[in-house]
Amino acid sequence: MAPARAFVLVLLAVASASTAAANTATTTPTNPVAAPTQWQKAHATFYGGADASGTMGGACGYGNLYSQGYGTRNAALSTALFNDGASCGQCYKIACDRKRAPQWCKPGVTVTITATNFCPPNWNLPSDNGGWCNPPRPHFDMAQPAWEKIGVYSAGIIPVIYQRVPCVKKGGLRFTINGHDYFQLVLVTNVAAAGSIKSMEVMGSNTADWMPMARNWGAQWHSLAYLTGQGLSFRVTNTDDQTLVFTNVVPPGWKFGQTFASKLQFK
């Protein structure tokens, strides 16, 4: 897994009228917010140790899951669910399937996790004996504390039922700026509702138009424009086709490595 990165969290003041106005522009969603999906069958294993420290980093690019607010309720998704990183940030409610393995299930409990990593295939092992994340299997390799909420430790792997659910977050979206001149790499975290981002655009305070950003990997988006020193605005569309505009959420004079918090959130 990628090493965890330390980020400086810079909270923007929201008391002034100008800042309040800067973070209230929205675009009417073309689709309603998605309801929880139907329950589906899968399997789940665990990794990362009892404190989930081994889950830090990962293919979604969140880095330190503790400091980013994802904690120990996270999981790596198999190819069938990961969608080349487009599923990063999505939330799933998972229960052990007592109909298939009552002896390994803790009754009457569910756990909700966030997709933060990718569980790669292991083509050296059969899909039903070690190659748990091989396509086309839907599989969750969960942080151990989350897995132990629903399964008996000695089982190692359990059948589960799962449904995708809206993510619940406190506060607004956060934007971490990394990279260098002519390459801004923006990590978007703390995304509620759909949890995952479909598209993203950026506008500098000295530019006239929105410029599309590209998914670099996981929840990281990049722009190749020269925007150093400019205030930055973002137009973000989630996978439920809701759009929010974060006007001047990053002030002029920002530095690479800083994180900027907005008060806007998907609902």
From Swiss-Prot:
Cell compartment(s), UniProt: Secreted, Cell wall; Membrane
Keywords: Cell wall, Cell wall biogenesis/degradation, Membrane, Secreted, Signal
Membrane topology, record value: Peripheral membrane protein
One cellular component (GO) term of this entry: extracellular region
The UniProt record lists the keyword Membrane: yes
Segments forming domain Expansin-like CBD: 182-262
Gene Ontology BP annotations: plant-type cell wall loosening
Leader peptide range in chain numbering: 1-21
Segments forming domain Expansin-like EG45: 57-172
Primary location class: secreted
Superkingdom per UniProt: Eukaryota
Pfam families: DPBB_1, Expansin_C
Main function: May cause loosening and extension of plant cell walls by disrupting non-covalent bonding between cellulose microfibrils and matrix glucans. No enzymatic activity has been found. May be required for rapid internodal elongation in deepwater rice during submergence.
PANTHER family xref list: EXPANSIN-A15 (PTHR31867)
Similarity section: Belongs to the expansin family. Expansin A subfamily.
Protein name, UniProt field: Expansin-A23
